[in-house]
């Protein structure tokens, strides 16, 4: 089936690298700058790099926030990437503005007592806690690339689908509920493993986007 994919452009995103990755998968996308651009879109990607409060301010300036809330409440397909994952939650310790609140929980600073350098930059393996459209059945093959100083703590443990090691602790790597999900790492910068994740997501969309339990 033909898939109309929207990439949200709000001045905080790694748009070019995501676009190039999608091109390699033979999938085009439309940039979403305002609510009019949502017409005819089947699924959205919310990318992001930077800080929480400026990101929410930029999203509000586009007028997209109420439309994204309705999109999530209607359980339409949405994929957050990096900061895009954090914006799906209710609040962040990085700022004072509320997030979108499509997923319950809070974003907290990575633990300094872990002994690891912050920001966390580099490759890490995934530990699966459930299934979702991004993940393969072979967790050992999934090393992915992270750049972040904060991580989400979901209220509902069932929303956590994968974590990654940070020092002696595990931090959130993938969250998913229904058709709304996100990854803290950058799949578009995670070589073959990340590309295969996006390919699985696109296949899931084309096959009808069955909600994830």
From Swiss-Prot:
InterPro entries: Class_I_gatase-like (IPR029062), GATASE (IPR017926), Imidazole-glycPsynth_HisH (IPR010139). Pfam families: GATase. It comes from the Bacteria. Its EC number is 4.3.2.10, 3.5.1.2. The active site is at residues 82, 186, 188. It catalyses: 5-[(5-phospho-1-deoxy-D-ribulos-1-ylimino)methylamino]-1-(5-phospho-beta-D-ribosyl)imidazole-4-carboxamide + L-glutamine = D-erythro-1-(imidazol-4-yl)glycerol 3-phosphate + 5-amino-1-(5-phospho-beta-D-ribosyl)imidazole-4-carboxamide + L-glutamate + H(+); L-glutamine + H2O = L-glutamate + NH4(+). GO terms for molecular function: glutaminase activity; imidazoleglycerol-phosphate synthase activity; lyase activity. Pathway: Amino-acid biosynthesis; L-histidine biosynthesis; L-histidine from 5-phospho-alpha-D-ribose 1-diphosphate: step 5/9. This is Imidazole glycerol phosphate synthase subunit HisH. It comes from Synechococcus sp. (strain CC9605).
